[in-house]
């Protein structure tokens, strides 16, 4: 193709989202008022530009609706003329819409069935506001996910749903998803064209459409200069055909309509909005405004690439902005409890223990109508990214209310399905003969989703741990009785605060493919006082079994964690610490000495435990107190850690500020990092880069290497990386040995629970690449670096002008955090299937039914999960919001709204140094 034939296709894509984390549900600027204002101005500007008869004809737009449920509903309710104008422009084929989601969901936070239903409703729904219903024939089959989130398995689902490609940021500043992770770097043909985007877990692929934001315009001085740079690449043959430049950014940004400036500097490029784009295209005959639906079929595919980490356009190109606040863990744990109830129901159905109630259970969980309050509908609404961020470290109070209302409804539906399943399944249990003994029925949760990857098998033993009914605990205590399980399953009975807890290791051999549940009988026996001699032991300075040995120094610090004689830990392994103080040079606070207490010495032959207490002050009179219970079981190669941290409450007078924030909750910015139980593995990348394995909610097990310096050497050391979506566990390995870290979702859960800190040459001795792992904690620090063919100023000015680089650590102030971990050392690269299976069933523990021999009563030890709804109502005062649909709630919020009354806004004037002002001035001149 000769140069005269080559075009630059310029696609403009405003990202429309009226549902925000740092604003509420007001019709004014404290809510979605700015969205209403800017959306109207964009359409007005398009009309004016069209009336001016530029050479290119109508300016084409690729509208990017983040969701139907909030944004389109609100447009239809409060801005129907605007929605009608978009519909009309699409009818005239000036515009198109690209694919987002029905519920503004973080798509990697969903399972397969949920994502497929979300996409289905996005396109067509009974509310009548699906993209295909509103914009027939103008739905481009290309997705721009909310926050450009991506994880493995999405490509396969997109292929099934007819989605042909995905728009992902490949930007030069910290509003990006792919740039630091794609190796080799995309060449010019790929950066301004199409790339085959491969899955790392199958042979599936889709189109990658590299996408850019307004910050990238800054990096090239102006849109006109950027066009000319691309043209030079076409002239030199670096781009051998047409080029595509897709510009996608939040619709509520003033950059679309133009920034008001003093008259003396109105000449500045990058401030003129759509009109500036129109003038540039009008002056350059080789540039055309384009819709993706029209131009992508004309473009060739240039090479291929794979993105191995899980990514989003948050801080550090990952999930920091939605996963690292204290409330993110708290909220997600609520959701996982609802999920547990749902999965119990599905497991009982798939095990053919429920037949009569199958249809009503399925209707409650997965009704295909978006008008029905099903579990899946409310799970999708709950999993909106807005309910978890972007606002940091606090969310808007109204956003907390709506978020909790959706998890409340999801739990309500899951509980109803659970009760129907138990009602039928328990009748079969009641019919079984007990011979005067307690009967226990155990159901490992094997049905966790729609796909084969979400159907689990039992490939290992697993841990069963539950409190006995009060009447049984009383009888055991009163009559000095113990428990014998007739099947001779390893177990221990432990008493704490008057209640008895039974802990068992259930052998894999008890299950088979035809029957993935078992019955056990509990016999009361005389207490045995004989001590069992084996290699299970807890002393004042060590904890060990046949596989693992943990040692403590004279200060009570854990300094060695050995598996089969090989060291897996470093000094201060499992340390609690807080980084507090100045942003650039904070102090790290931690305990100088830990108290150790032997809880179980191992003499019962089943388990041994040590409690480690750490206490330190951040400020005088402001202590942090951490308790960690470390447990080993006989003949099991795993360490279990129960963590309970009480953080002191240090509040300040700072608050989150941007041009539209209405979050007034104050905090102390000196909170920088929080490490509740920091893992310091002795796993060194001295021969190759370290590797992370993880399992996501689609059931996909995948890995990524910590090789970001191959893309950009400046990213050899990374202060925080949150690039692993995790349904239960992740591992770190140097391909010779590895360590799996998993969590119990019913205690604490987070979809990205382990931020990482990476050092190329180690944290103390220069032995090789090292990593710190921070379960349920928070790291912070310098952002990633972004290679560029531009001036590099997008990254510099982006940090100056954006207030989103806030630490989430202040959200932990005054909070109590409890979580349970499993640490499983292993040899090799990929974790063995046996360890994966154990971690899977630790994450979502088995469901248990007990039958009392006296009154034949059925008891459920996990019944507290069923009461979550009442807990949510008490804590979050949601009686009002759960009694309304969303539009009723919005009208309730706005019942006293006065559009003429000024609304408070948290704004902060620009405080620019001389260097920054000179950069902006010189770049402005160069952009002319």
Would you name each region that the model predicts?
Residues 79-80, 209-212, 696-697:
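Short, solvent-exposed helix-helix connector turns and helix-capping sites enriched
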Residues 17-19, 67-71, 103-105, 148-151, ...:
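Short, solvent-exposed loop/turn segments at secondary-structure junctions
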Residues 139-144, 150-332, 452, 457, ...:
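Aromatic- and carboxylate-enriched substrate-binding clefts and catalytic-loop regions
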Residues 21-31, 100-111, 139-140, 212-216, ...:
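Glycine- and acidic
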Residues 263-265, 272-928:
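Terminal accessory/anchoring regions of large secretory-pathway or extracellular enzymes
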Residues 14, 65, 99, 209-211, ...:
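Pocket-edge structural micro-motifs
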Residues 2-141, 148-207, 227-241, 275, ...:
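Catalytic alpha-helical scaffold of carbohydrate-active enzymes acting on polysaccharides/glycoconjugates
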Residues 23-34, 75-77, 256-269, 653-658:
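Short, flexible/disordered intra-domain loops and linkers
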């Amino acid at each position: 193709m000769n140069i005269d034939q080559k075009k630059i296709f310029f696609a403009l894509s405003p990202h429309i989202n009226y549902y925000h984390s740092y604003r509420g549900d007001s019709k004014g600027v404290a809510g979605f008022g700015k969205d209403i204002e800017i959306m109207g101005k964009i359409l007005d500007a398009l009309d004016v530009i069209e009336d001016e008869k530029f050479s290119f004809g109508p300016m084409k737009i690729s509208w990017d609706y983040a969701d139907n449920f909030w944004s389109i509903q609100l447009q239809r309710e409060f801005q129907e003329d605007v929605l009608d104008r978009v519909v009309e422009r699409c009818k005239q084929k000036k515009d198109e819409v690209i694919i987002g989601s029905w519920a503004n969901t973080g798509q990697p936070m969903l399972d397969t069935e949920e994502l497929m239903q979300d996409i289905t409703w996005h396109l067509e729904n009974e509310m009548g506001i699906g993209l295909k219903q509103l914009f027939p024939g103008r739905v481009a089959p290309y997705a721009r996910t909310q926050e450009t989130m991506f994880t493995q398995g999405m490509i396969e689902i997109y292929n099934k749903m007819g989605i042909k490609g995905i728009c992902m940021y490949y930007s030069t500043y910290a509003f990006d998803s792919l740039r630091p992770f794609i190796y080799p770097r995309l060449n010019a043909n790929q950066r301004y064209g199409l790339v085959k985007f491969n899955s790392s877990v199958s042979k599936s692929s889709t189109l990658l459409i590299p996408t850019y934001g307004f910050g990238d315009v800054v990096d090239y001085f102006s849109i006109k200069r950027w066009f000319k740079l691309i043209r030079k690449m076409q002239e030199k043959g670096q781009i051998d055909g047409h080029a595509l430049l897709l510009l996608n950014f939040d619709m509520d940004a003033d950059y679309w309509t133009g920034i008001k400036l003093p008259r003396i500097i109105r000449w500045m490029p990058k401030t003129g909005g759509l009109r500036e784009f129109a003038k540039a295209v009008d002056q350059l005959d080789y540039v055309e405004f384009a819709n993706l639906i029209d131009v992508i079929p004309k473009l060739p595919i240039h090479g291929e690439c794979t993105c191995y980490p899980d990514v989003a356009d948050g801080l550090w190109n990952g999930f920091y902005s939605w996963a690292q606040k204290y409330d993110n863990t708290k909220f997600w744990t609520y959701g996982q409890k609802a999920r547990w109830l749902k999965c119990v129901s599905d497991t009982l159905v798939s095990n053919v223990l429920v037949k009569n109630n199958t249809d009503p259970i399925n209707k409650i969980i997965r009704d295909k109508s978006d008008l029905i309050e099903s579990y899946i509908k409310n799970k999708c609404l709950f999993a909106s990214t807005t309910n978890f961020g972007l606002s940091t470290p606090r969310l808007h109070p109204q956003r907390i209310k709506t978020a909790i209302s959706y998890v409340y409804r999801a739990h309500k539906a899951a509980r109803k399905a659970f009760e129907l399943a138990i009602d039928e399944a328990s009748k079969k249990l009641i019919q079984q003969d007990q011979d005067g003994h307690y009967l226990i029925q155990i159901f490992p949760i094997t049905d966790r989703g729609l796909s084969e990857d979400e159907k689990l098998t039992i490939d290992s033993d697993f841990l069963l741990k539950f409190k006995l009914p009060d009447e049984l605990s009383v009888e055991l205590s009163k009559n000095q009785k113990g428990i014998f399980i007739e099947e001779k399953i390893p177990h221990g009975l432990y008493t704490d605060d008057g209640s008895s807890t039974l802990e068992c290791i259930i052998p894999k051999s008890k299950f088979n493919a035809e029957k993935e549940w078992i019955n056990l009988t509990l016999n009361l026996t005389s207490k045995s006082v004989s001590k069992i001699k084996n290699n299970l032991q807890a002393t004042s300075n060590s904890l060990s079994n046949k596989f693992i040995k943990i040692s403590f120094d004279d200060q009570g610090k854990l300094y060695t964690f050995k598996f089969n004689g090989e060291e897996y830990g470093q000094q201060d392994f499992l340390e609690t610490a807080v980084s507090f103080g100045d942003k650039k040079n904070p102090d790290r606070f931690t305990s100088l000495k830990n108290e150790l207490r032997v809880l179980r010495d191992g003499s019962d032959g089943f388990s041994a435990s040590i409690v480690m207490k750490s206490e330190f002050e951040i400020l005088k009179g402001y202590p942090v107190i951490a308790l960690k219970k470390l447990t080993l079981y006989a003949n099991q190669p795993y360490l279990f850690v129960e963590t309970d941290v009480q953080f002191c409450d240090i509040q300040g007078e700072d608050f989150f500020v941007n041009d539209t924030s209405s979050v007034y909750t104050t905090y102390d910015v000196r909170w920088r990092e929080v490490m509740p139980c920091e893992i310091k593995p002795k796993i060194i990348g001295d021969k190759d880069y370290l590797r992370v394995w993880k399992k996501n909610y689609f059931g996909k097990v995948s890995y990524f290497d910590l090789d970001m310096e191959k893309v950009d050497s400046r990213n050899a050391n990374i202060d925080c990386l949150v690039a692993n979506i995790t349904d239960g566990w992740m591992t770190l390995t140097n391909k010779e040995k590895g360590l799996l870290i998993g969590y119990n979702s019913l205690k604490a859960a987070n979809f990205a629970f382990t931020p990482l800190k990476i050092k190329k040459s180690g944290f103390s001795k220069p032995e090789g690449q090292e990593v710190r792992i921070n379960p349920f904690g928070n790291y912070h620090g310098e952002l990633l670096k972004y290679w560029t063919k531009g001036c590099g100023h997008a990254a510099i000015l982006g940090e100056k002008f954006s207030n989103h680089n806030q630490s989430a650590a202040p959200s932990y102030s005054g909070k109590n955090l409890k979580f349970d971990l499993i640490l499983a050392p292993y040899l090799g690269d990929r974790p063995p299937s046996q360890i994966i299976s154990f971690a899977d069933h630790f994450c979502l523990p088995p469901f248990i039914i007990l039958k009392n021999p006296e009154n034949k009563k059925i008891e459920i030890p996990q019944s507290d999960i069923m009461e979550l709804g009442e807990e949510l109502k008490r804590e979050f005062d949601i009686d009002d919001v759960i009694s309304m649909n969303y539009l009723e709630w919005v009208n309730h919020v706005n019942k006293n709204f006065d559009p003429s009354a000024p609304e408070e806004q948290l704004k902060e004037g620009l405080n620019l140094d001389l260097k920054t002002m000179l950069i902006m001035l010189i770049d402005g001149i160069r952009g002319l």
